[in-house]
Swiss-Prot record:
Annotated family: Belongs to the cytochrome c oxidase subunit 3 family.
GO BP, sorted A to Z: aerobic electron transport chain; ATP synthesis coupled electron transport
Gene that specifies this protein: qoxC
Main location: membrane
Protein name: Quinol oxidase subunit 3
Residues that span the membrane, as ranges: 27-47, 66-86, 95-115, 140-160, 184-204
Broad class of enzyme this protein falls into: oxidoreductase
Source organism per UniProt: Bacillus spizizenii (strain ATCC 23059 / NRRL B-14472 / W23) (Bacillus subtilis subsp. spizizenii)
Length: 204
């Protein structure tokens, strides 16, 4: 039983406990559901993208510089998140904490930029009720931004556990699972950047 619980000691730390392996498998299934959710939101957005109701158009409001900053912050955070997992596998608690905190700061910067963006759009007359396009836009990006915010608080909780328990197969599996979640959100953002912003800046 002990062997079954701890598994192969040569495996990455996050896979060394049966609980960790099952949690990782379960999270992959959860990500499948998330893919369905965002696919539905993207499909809805693309159906509504030309329905601006004669109101403000996306190319009149979208700001290239802000979008590029947001993209930079999130993509770099994916890189730093990957480094944190690498440090975890090296057994460096300090490295995990440092790179995870950097990831959180970059994520917080992204959320701050998105909130600023939304406030600006609403001030300029684009809101959920302005048109079908803006309704689809705010729901899609708001859902993504909410996921990023949840991820930030989730990872903060993992950092607290790391401080109390250190690097164990259990905490390592949580770090790895949170990294999968974070990378998934980065991939979703790439689709948002391409399908929403680039098309919007091109006048739909």
């Amino acid at each position: 039983m002990e062997h079954a619980e701890h598994g192969n000691s040569n495996a990455p730390m996050e896979y060394q406990s049966e609980t960790g392996r099952l949690n990782i498998l379960g999270f992959w299934i959860f990500l499948g559901a998330e893919i369905v959710l965002f696919s539905t939101l993207f499909a809805t957005f693309f159906v509504l993208q030309n329905r601006t109701a004669g109101g403000v158009l996306p190319d009149e409001l979208f700001e290239v510089n802000l979008v590029m900053i947001m993209t930079f912050l999130l993509l770099i955070s994916s890189f730093t998140c990957g480094i944190a997992v690498h440090e975890m596998r090296r057994g460096s608690l300090k490295g995990v904490v440092i790179w995870t905190i950097i990831t959180l700061l970059l994520g917080a910067g992204f959320v701050g930029c998105e909130i600023n963006e939304f406030v600006h759009y609403v001030h300029e007359g684009a809101s959920l009720g302005t048109s079908a396009f803006w309704s689809g836009f705010f729901v899609l990006l708001g859902t993504h931004g909410t996921h990023v915010t949840i991820g930030i608080f989730w990872i903060i909780g993992i950092l607290i556990q790391l401080k109390k328990r250190g690097l164990t197969p259990q905490t390592s599996s949580k770090i790895f699972i949170s990294s999968l979640y974070w990378h998934f959100l980065d991939v979703v953002w790439i689709f948002i950047f391409t399908g929403v912003y680039l098309m919007g800046l091109g006048g739909l």
